[in-house]
Amino acid sequence: MVRRLLALSRPLYWLYEQRLLREVKRGPMPRHLGLILDGNRRYARALGLSPTKGHEFGVQKAYEVLEWCLEMGIKTVTVWVFSTDNFKRPPEEVETLMNLFLREAERMAEDHRILEHQVRVRFIGRREGFSPEVVRAIERLERRTEGHRGMFLNIALGYGGREEIVDAVKRLLLEAEARGLSPKEVAEGLTPEDIARHLYTAGLPDPDFIIRTSGEIRLSGFLLWQSAYSEFYFADVLWPEFRKIDFLRALRSYQARERRFGR
């Protein structure tokens, strides 16, 4: 009986997905979509699996969602993969994640989806704490795709929103010192635009829309500066379970909102 119901539900699911897809494609898309990929470990725990398996499922879902973004014509996507706080996790889990980052960076450099769709990949965050092998792999991927003019994909690795702002201020002060400016001169002339020009995402539009999975209703420091006027959507589903219908519903919610930008 259960199998029969499942068999009957699949065509209905597909029909609903196609109707939703047509509806959403008619509306405006975010220029820059932020994704907080949350829930891999809880998903694995619910299935009685190791955290490593949860992260493996999460990687495959990330590729799937990237394809959805390409289909919808979203030009810039930032995915938060690993925070500075994640270094505090058990050493064996961190080591597993490092191996996963190395493998996927090498894989993406040859991935036909990245190459065919001209996806430019850039990693944002601090690289201290990552092995030389991981750093070389992500730098190779960045070089391999730096001439691409399709989607711009930021992968936030070793990222923290507070750390990003601190790093931006440090760079700004060092540049000012090199130009012979005093701290007083820097303080008197400092503007929000000066800070923005030194962020990891400098030159890119701020995120219009940020989706977080797992039901957690917080940013946890993701793109703190850039998200001042972002719209948010908190999906009550773990990242590996995030379906295309969930993605389309999120975009539909974004399209229904009136963005005021503080006015």
Swiss-Prot record:
Instruction: Give the matching PANTHER family.
Output: DEHYDRODOLICHYL DIPHOSPHATE SYNTHASE COMPLEX SUBUNIT DHDDS, DEHYDRODOLICHYL DIPHOSPHATE SYNTHASE FAMILY MEMBER
Organism the protein comes from: Thermus thermophilus (strain ATCC BAA-163 / DSM 7039 / HB27)
Pfam families of this UniProt entry? Prenyltransf (PF01255)
Mind listing the UniProt keywords for this protein, alphabetically? Magnesium, Metal-binding, Transferase
Where, by residue number, does substrate bind?
G39, N40, R41, R42, H55, S83, T84, D85, F87, R89, R212, R218, L219, S220
User: How is this protein organized at the quaternary level?
Assistant: Homodimer.
Q: Which PROSITE patterns match?
A: UPP_SYNTHASE
Q: Which residues form the active site?
A: D38, N86
EC annotation? 2.5.1.-
UniProt similarity note? Belongs to the UPP synthase family.
Where would one find coiled-coil regions in this protein?
A: none
Q: What does this protein do?
A: Catalyzes the condensation of isopentenyl diphosphate (IPP) with allylic pyrophosphates generating different type of terpenoids.
GO terms for biological process, alphabetical: polyprenol biosynthetic process
GO MF, one term, reads: magnesium ion binding
The reply on keyword Transferase is yes
Question: Does the keyword section mention Metal-binding?
Answer: yes
Q: Specify which residues bind Mg(2+) according to the UniProt entry for this protein.
A: D38, E231
Q: What does this protein need as cofactor?
A: Mg(2+)
Co-factor binding details = Binds 2 magnesium ions per subunit.
What is this protein's record name?
Isoprenyl transferase
